[in-house]
């Protein structure tokens, strides 16, 4: 999990301009990290590129927190 979490954290920090310490598994992209809907779509696209996978729109809607993203990626690698 550490490797996936580290890679996800780097993408979030780069995309949203938040501090690395704010990117914890329980952090909500919208409420805690200040992302808007477009930011979330762009994050999903970056995660798809980084992990060489496709995340369906239906699954993307269920990814609301950093932990959700890490869990999803780990279960689909």
From Swiss-Prot:
GO biological process: any one? lipid A biosynthetic process
Q: Which organism is it from?
A: Bacillus cereus (strain ATCC 14579 / DSM 31 / CCUG 7414 / JCM 2152 / NBRC 15305 / NCIMB 9373 / NCTC 2599 / NRRL B-3711)
* Pathway of action: Lipid metabolism; fatty acid biosynthesis
Gene Ontology CC annotation, any one: membrane
Q: Which gene encodes it?
A: acpP
Alphabetized SUPFAM superfamilies for the sequence = ACP-like
Q: Which residues form the Carrier domain?
A: 2-77
Q: Which GO terms describe its molecular function?
A: acyl binding; acyl carrier activity
Specify the protein name: Acyl carrier protein
Family under the similarity heading: Belongs to the acyl carrier protein (ACP) family.
Tell me which UniProt keywords the record has, alphabetically.
Cytoplasm, Fatty acid biosynthesis, Fatty acid metabolism, Lipid biosynthesis, Lipid metabolism, Phosphopantetheine, Phosphoprotein
Q: How is it modified after translation?
A: 4'-phosphopantetheine is transferred from CoA to a specific serine of apo-ACP by AcpS. This modification is essential for activity because fatty acids are bound in thioester linkage to the sulfhydryl of the prosthetic group.
**In terms of domain of life, where is this protein from?**
Bacteria
Localization (cell): Cytoplasm
Q: Which InterPro entries match?
A: ACP, ACP-like_sf, PP-bd_ACP, Ppantetheine_attach_site
Function, as annotated? Carrier of the growing fatty acid chain in fatty acid biosynthesis.
Give one Pfam hit by family name: PP-binding
The signal peptide here is: none
Which PANTHER family does this UniProt record tie to the protein?
A: ACYL CARRIER PROTEIN, CARRIER DOMAIN-CONTAINING PROTEIN
Question: Which residues are annotated as modified residue O-(pantetheine 4'-phosphoryl)serine in the UniProt record?
Answer: 37
Gene3D superfamilies registered for this protein in UniProt = ACP-like
């Amino acid at each position: 999990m550490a490797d996936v979490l580290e890679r996800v954290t780097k993408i979030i920090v780069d995309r949203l301009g938040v501090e690395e310490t704010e990117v914890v598994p329980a952090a909500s992209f919208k409420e805690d990290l200040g992302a808007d809907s477009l930011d979330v779509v762009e994050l999903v696209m970056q995660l798809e590129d980084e992990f060489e996978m496709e995340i369906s729109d239906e699954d993307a809607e269920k990814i609301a927190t950093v932990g959700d993203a890490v869990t999803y990626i780990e279960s689909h690698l």
